Amino acid sequence: HYGLEDCREITLEANPDDLSKEYLQMLSALPFNRISMGIQTFDDATLKLLKRRHNARTATEAVRRCREAGYQNISIDLIYGLPGETKERWEKDLRQAISLNVEHISAYHLIYEEDTPIYNMLKQHQICEVDEDSSLEFFTLLIEYLQKAGYEHYEISNFCRPGYYSRHNTSYWKGIPYLGCGPSAHSFNGTTREWNISSIDRYIKGIEEGQRVFETEYLGPTTRYNEFRSEEHTSELQSHHDLV
């Protein structure tokens, strides 16, 4: 068993369409003090292409409901480099994200993972990958828009209002232990990394039957050092961009 009394950050990961008024009322009895939701984009056509269940209006209303439920630390995820992305569309996404006035914004470039529907669409030439010049332009716009809006660029993909950096993100790169609960969640105890199975049904059944519901990876000194150096390099690149 784990005591949660001293946890300064307990984050719930959710999809916008999950955050109904009733669901948030149920959460009020639990010790979550931060909500992170995967909005990805405010372009409804692209959300449909990505097979997301929510639309732009659902995402905006989810943030509003979280505020009404009393949450003062909200994070949203965005993705850029999406199929058909243009400078104008990305700027519109950034303006809408800023208008929500959330405490934290993470933005990641789209990665085409093998054996996913969108990867298959790319290989079948149904969609096109954005070029490197456009990707760089989108990243530059991301930094310019969010810093101008008062967000601190504290990690390569993460921006926050002053005092609202993600403790999990910074702990991850510093090698500090963390606990992840639920399907697909990751944990680290200082020497091993664990990740729970992704199937909700198998996860629940495994817990009920006392079965192992996670995989384990031992991180030797070399692996931990390489990850530390990777983060140092990322920080150097970020500092260089800020200077430029």
Segments from the language model and where they lie:
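C-terminal scaffold of the Radical SAM
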Residues: 1-235, 239
